[in-house]
């Protein structure tokens, strides 16, 4: 899939996949996400996602209903136990920065986790297959969402480093990530529902048949 390519399928021949970078990312055009998709279109998008890892659908004025319908083509949707959701749509998280909001000591702890490299909801026993972001308002500057190819990062590690991390386990802890935002009672309920998830640092991506890094705090270290 080097350069611009069209998906060869009777029902998906209008879909155009245009890579945006050498390692990951592609724009998908020739499709309207405000309308139901055919199985062939869904299969084409899934194949593009496995290959390119990050997909961009530009100028899609989708509603909340469209957002949920599109997500369900790829599996069951998950809510979030802490982050606010859209009224009537528990599957959609509501992420907003108020106009003119200043970074103060009070808001910094809330903004800090999202302003560093992370993968969402890894505290679940089974990590999410993907997330679907919809931008409604873009800041005049900044506000970029940046993606990294963790499979490429792992592939480029020196052999001695790969050997060192071969058996390392990472601890994915919902309380470490969100405990400061909830009451002690709520934290106890979260811990009961989401026990500490221990996962191998070197994780497998089954669909792409590749190894990648799924990092977090390493067990036995500060």
Model-derived segments and spans:
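Non-heme Fe(II) oxygenase catalytic core, chiefly the N-lobe of the double-stranded beta-helix
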Residues: 2-222
